[in-house]
From Swiss-Prot:
Variant or mutagenesis effect after changing K888A: Binds zinc, still binds secB
Protein name: Protein translocase subunit SecA
Enzyme Commission number: 7.4.2.8
Gene name, Swiss-Prot/TrEMBL: secA
Pfam families: P-loop_SecA, SEC-C, SecA_DEAD, SecA_PP_bind, SecA_SW
Membrane topology: Peripheral membrane protein
GO molecular function term, any single one: ATP binding
Length: 901
């Protein structure tokens, strides 16, 4: 600690000192607010709104607003906000992250900033990690907010459009992070303003902010459509992978291995060696999937390479019951941070299909991205952003760097007395499991409840089998049993209860010492007062037993890559001043040790074990683990920051496109925009044949006439104009061409009516924009995947990505203008008389075909508008419309049948 910090206190201490002055002010108001009637207290909401309209700021009314919520909470919920909760509420109002320990009442704390900021009328979004928490928190706080005249909405998957609009129209909306992001993307795919859901993105309060803004940061939200089906290729390539041999190190000048591929476990990437490449190519040629003499790395074989690498990663880097589970014939991803399943999510880049082929389930088609955004960029769209969690301080630097959010550690209401014991290390996993079982046995005998944290479904099941063998009764909470999550967590605080949980499964629900009598009461149908009193008495007895036994004991079966996840596991114990204890059991076979410690350190540690099964505890061990975790955290932070730098490029483009789209949806008349685009497009085309400030000898008039005819359907005798009028120069010629294009367009408009033409313009513009944006996203994906190769040419990949993507974006905008004007200029408008004449002609032709015994296409639904002509005396051209009226070319309709006959 520096001398200045000793004198002035840390930044956190200074912030808390300042906020405590506000707490004193709020506490002084309490007697006056207690004296108010219910109606007078309710009337405060309208009073605050009027004062805000009159020019007062949120900070000016904050003390009174917080005092109002506190008093209303006492009357409606029977809960009074602690002083530390008032501090938390003020921190959340100030665009900060409040670190509040487990059990300190984050749900109640959130009511303070939500009420205050909702007074502005812009809407408040409270963001949770799953549907259960969104519903639970909304129903818990709904009576309080409705008492104060605020409406509450819940936005979760599966709502109808009307229910979703009602949820967003509420003053305070509880929602999951994924649903908010997807609704944003859906709004920007809407074809009318009535289809949109979200209002202005004003204030988001993110619960478990570390989980959403850090753990999920690299997960893009993607809305996709089906791409070309290549399921058979995944199944074929899947057969190749088991024959490939792993090589421990990459080939160098000094070392030439005998394997076919190497793995980078940190980045979860696989690489073929030269030997492996040859082996794969020979197999593909033998299977007829690649011609002889071709290379896997040639541009024409990029799709094959993509399938091979996806299959290799699926087999070597992704484990069943660790990274995913197989459920009802589908691959379901397991969240590496929470241990929860993520139904409906799919890995991209063909990885999900490769895993489906590996596990022998139905291989679904690949998808093409239609719209996407990362959580990092979505939450930065909000005017105000704040968050709360039990563990943010270790990631404070990242929150500040990426989101501009300061982290403030809120003191606990009561001192924390949990006993965090030193880690113990074992030589191998078997010795470690033996020690864990002995620790659990000791706790069970003393009637102390135990929560055992594992890092994967597989490890939780291994430990469960070991406990079964030892005859210890226990519950398992992992991705396979997530439906029973609330029930298992409710029982985890009973005397002698043993619960195995993957990572932070059950996070967001407190483990109450002695069990949860309310959860037991909820199981009873219409419980009597006597039954409730009996449950309370039973709980009090169990609570006393558990308190005497030492509270909840936490066992970590290995260290996670992030200190924050370890702290979250420990944080389940010792809530609100309760007793508790924690200890981590480690082995040299743990993933963290294998991947992030070099062989030298591992050998040194192996030598320290002289007796089989002995445990090692030392300060050096703590330093080694801290060093490994710091490396991993830095590696992941760099990855997230790197992703954001690339995604920021796409984000600027996304913002521009969505702004243009919203402008189109909000305006029924875009004729001015169309006119401006028409001038740009025609001038651009003319420039190619009549360069600006050029001599007449340099003009390519014939080429211009052909181009205008082919692209825009305009037959203009420009050569004749020039012969007839010697005064026609470059500018006047341009004006004449554009004037004719505008005149022809006006004539079409006169035929169909102004409203119909405006509607048509808008439809063409939206459809073209969406199609080109979808293609652009696919191109950006390909660019992103290969841009790192520019580094070999001594170029900065990020700068190259920015330049290339800007060029592609500019080309897309030019293409948008061109395609819109081409479509609008070429469109043919028919009068009612022409339509009737065309229908008569179609019927005559159909009759003539029947006379000639040509079968009419029964599937034909469209009518081809064409002039009446006798086809019986001449041969029909292959590319002419088929006389049957199907709308198809003759060669694709009856022409093909005639050829077959």
């Amino acid at each position: 600690m520096s001398i200045l910090t000793r004198i002035f206190g840390s930044r956190n201490e200074r912030v808390l000192r300042k906020l405590k002055k506000q707490v004193v002010k709020i506490n002084k108001m309490e007697p006056a607010f207690e004296a108010l009637s219910d109606d007078e207290l309710k009337a405060k909401t309208q009073e605050f709104r009027d004062r805000l309209s009159g020019g007062e700021t949120l900070q000016q009314i904050l003390p009174e607003a917080f005092a109002t919520v506190r008093e209303a909470s006492k009357r409606v919920l029977g809960m009074r906000h602690f002083d530390v909760q008032l501090i938390g509420g003020m921190v959340l109002t100030n665009r900060c992250i409040a670190e509040m320990r487990t059990g300190e009442g984050k749900t109640l704390t959130a009511t303070l900033p939500c009420y205050l900021i909702a007074l502005e009328g812009k809407g408040v979004h409270v963001v949770t990690v799953n549907d259960y928490l969104a519903r639970r928190d909304a129903e818990t706080n709904r009576p309080l907010f409705e008492f104060l005249g605020m409406s509450v909405g819940v936005n979760i998957p599966g709502l109808s459009p009307e229910e979703k609009r009602a949820a967003y129209a509420a003053d305070i909306t509880y929602a999951t992070n994924s649903e908010l992001g997807f609704d944003y993307l859906r709004d920007n795919l809407a074809h009318s303003k009535e289809e949109r859901f979200q209002r202005t993105l004003g204030y988001a309060l993110v619960d478990e902010v570390d989980s959403i803004l850090i753990d999920e940061a690299r997960t893009p939200l993607i809305i996709s459509g089906q791409a070309e089906n290549s399921s058979e290729l995944y199944i074929a390539v899947n057969k190749l992978i088991p024959s490939l041999i792993k090589q421990e190190k990459e080939d160098t000048e000094e070392y030439q291995g005998e394997g076919d591929f190497t793995l980078d476990l940190k980045s979860k990437q696989a690489h073929l060696t030269e030997r492996g490449q040859e082996k794969v190519e020979d197999w593909l040629i033998a299977q007829g999937l690649m011609p002889e003499g071709d290379s896997l790395y040639s541009p024409s074989r990029i799709v094959l390479l993509h399938h091979v690498m996806a299959a290799l990663r699926a087999h070597t880097l992704f484990e069943k019951d660790v990274d995913y589970i197989v459920k009802d014939g589908e691959i379901v991803i397991v969240d590496e941070h929470t241990g929860r399943t993520m139904a409906g999510r799919r890995w991209s880049d063909g990885l999900h299909q490769a895993i489906e082929a590996k596990e022998g389930v139905d291989v679904k088609s690949e998808n093409q991205t239609v719209a996407s955004i990362s959580y990092q960029n979505y939450f930065r769209l909000y005017e105000r952003l704040a968050g709360m969690t039990g563990t943010a301080d270790t990631e404070a630097f990242e929150f500040q760097q990426i989101y501009g959010l300061e982290t403030v550690v809120i003191p606990t209401n009561r001192p924390m007395i949990r006993d965090d014991r030193t880690d113990v290390m074992f030589e191998n996993e078997q010795y470690k499991f033996n020690a864990i079982i002995e620790d659990i046995k000791d706790c069970v005998e003393r009637q102390q409840p135990v929560l055992v944290g594992t890092i994967s479904v597989e490890k939780s099941e291994e430990l469960s089998k070991a406990l079964d063998k030892a005859g210890i009764k226990h519950n398992v909470l992992n991705a396979k049993f997530h439906q029973q999550e609330a029930e298992i967590v409710a029982e985890a605080g009973f005397p002698s209860a043993v619960t195995i949980a993957t990572n932070m499964a059950g996070r967001g629900t407190d483990i109450i010492l002695g069990g949860n009598w309310k959860a037991q009461a909820a199981k009873l149908e219409n419980p009597t007062q006597e039954q409730i009193e009996a449950l309370k008495a039973e709980w009090e007895k169990n609570h006393e037993i558990v308190m005497k036994a030492g509270g909840l004991h936490i066992i970590g079966t290995e260290r996670h890559e992030s200190r924050r996840i370890d702290n979250q596991l420990r944080g389940r114990s010792g809530r609100q001043g309760d007793p508790g204890s924690s200890r981590f059991y480690l082995s040299l076979e743990d993933g963290l040790m294998r991947i992030y410690l070099n062989e030298g350190k591992l050998n040194l540690m192996r030598k320290a074990f002289t007796v089989a099964g002995e445990a090692m505890e030392s300060k050096m061990l703590a330093k080694v683990i801290a060093s490994a975790q710091a490396k991993v955290e830095a590696f992941h932070f760099d990855g997230r920051k790197n992703l954001l730098e690339y995604d920021d490029v796409a984000n600027d483009q996304r913002h521009a496109i969505y702004e243009q789209r919203n402008h189109l949806l909000d305006n029924d008349d875009i004729s001015e925009t169309i006119n401006a685009i028409r001038h740009d497009v025609f001038n651009g085309v003319i420039d190619q044949y009549i360069p600006p400030q050029s001599l007449e000898e340099q003009w390519d008039i014939k080429g211009l006439e052909e181009r205008l005819s082919q692209e825009f359907g305009m037959e203009l005798p420009i050569s004749n104009w020039l012969e007839e009028d010697n005064n026609l120069h470059e500018e006047s010629l341009r004006e004449r061409i554009v004037e004719i294009a505008e005149k022809e367009y006006k004539e079409k408009e006169a035929l169909v009516g102004e409203d119909a033409m405006r509607h048509f313009e808008k439809g063409v513009m939206l459809q073209t924009l969406d199609e080109l944006w979808k293609e652009h996203l696919a191109s950006m994906d390909y660019l992103r995947q290969g841009i790192h190769l520019r580094g070999y040419a001594q170029k900065d990949p990020k700068q190259e990505y920015k330049k290339e993507s800007f060029r592609m974006f500019t080309e897309m905008l030019d293409s948008l203008k061109h395609q819109v004007i081409t479509a609008l200029t070429r469109v043919r408008v028919r009068t009612q008389e022409e339509m009737e004449e065309a229908e008569r002609a179609r019927q005559e032709m159909a009759a003539r075909i029947n006379q000639n015994n040509l079968p009419v296409d029964e599937n034909s639904q469209t009518t081809q508008n064409s002039e009446t002509e006798d086809y019986s005396d001449r041969r029909i051209g292959r590319n002419e419309p088929c006389p049957c009226g199907s709308g198809k070319k003759y060669k694709h309709c009856h022409g093909s049948r005639v050829a077959r006959q």
